Amino acid sequence: FAFLGGQRQRYAYWGFEACGTQTSFSWNQANLKHGPKPEEKERIRLLPIPLSMPQNRGDENLVRAGEAAGQAEQAKLTMLAWELYRRESVQVRREPERFLDILCSWGARPYACIRQGAFAGYVALCVDPKRDRAEIKEMVLEKGVSAKAVLHGLADSLGIRQGTVTVDYGKQEMMRELEEICESQNLGWGHRFLIMDWPRVLTAMLELKQYCSPLQEKEAVLGITEPSGKRTAVKIRVEAGKITVTGEERKEPRKGEIELTAAMAARMLFCSTQIYYKELEGIPESWFPLPLYVSEQDCC
C-alpha cells in the first residue's frame, strides 16, 4: 500500500482513501499533579539528540574536539533509537542514515529517554514555543518503560506540562497506562491510504490483530472492485489460529460474497465506524476494524 497526508478529496481522485485507526491521548498539568506518579526508579530524563554542532569561535583544537564528541553522541543515540524502532511490531522501512531526518519531519525534534543513566527509548516532539505544550509525534520505549514517566519527564526536563500523543494499536500496555492518567482520548482516522495488494495487507493486519486478541474462526469472501473496474475476490479464512488470505481476479460475483468498492472496503475494514455499516453482517466482529497505522513522521 501507499500512504500520504493532505486534503482528502485532492488525493481521493488518485484512489487514496481516508482510513486507518489511530488513538490520541491528551494530558494537562492537572493530570500530572493529581494523577498516578512514577516510582523513583522509573523516572525519565529527556536528553536532546543533537542535530548538529554549533560553530564556536575560539581554540580550533577545542572546537574540533567538541564537534567530534557531538557527532559521536549523535551517532550513538541515533543508532540506539533506530535499533529500538526496528523491533516495533508495525514499522516503515527507515534506513539508518535517514532515520534522524525522518524523526525531524513536521518540525519535530528527537529526544532520548534516559532511565537510571541508560537509554530507555525516544520521542519526537513538536513543541509550541509560546506555551508549555507539545505534540508527541512518535514515542518508542524499551519494554517495561513507563509512558506516564515520560510525560512527567517532559515536565521535569523541558517544562512541558500538556500535550497530545498518538499510539498505534499494537501498543496495548502503553494505551492502558495512558488511559489512567490522560484527560481525554480520541479515536480517528490515520492518513490517506491506497491499497494495492489486498491479500497481503489484510494478512498482515489480521495477524497483528490476532497478536493482540484472538480472532473468531470463519471463512468469508469479499468482492472488491477498483475504480478501473478490476474486481478481486478476496477469500479470508481463520482456522485453528491460522490466517489465510487469497485473491482471485474475476468479474462475476458468486453467492455469499460481499460486494464492496475499493473506497468502501478501505473505510469499512480499516475504520472504527465500520460498526455502523450493514454490509459486513455475517463477518465476525473480532476481525474488523483492522489496525492500519503508520507514524505521521513517515508521512512526509
Regions found by a protein language model. Give the residues of each.
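Amide-forming acyltransferase catalytic core, primarily the GNAT-like/NAT-type
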Residues: Q22-K148, H152-T164, Y169-Q172, S184-F193, ...
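Active-site/acyl-donor-binding loops of N-acyltransferases
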Residues: Q9, G15-H34, L141-K148, H152-C300
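Short, glycine/charge-rich beta-strand/loop segments that flank catalytic centers
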Residues: F1-Y11
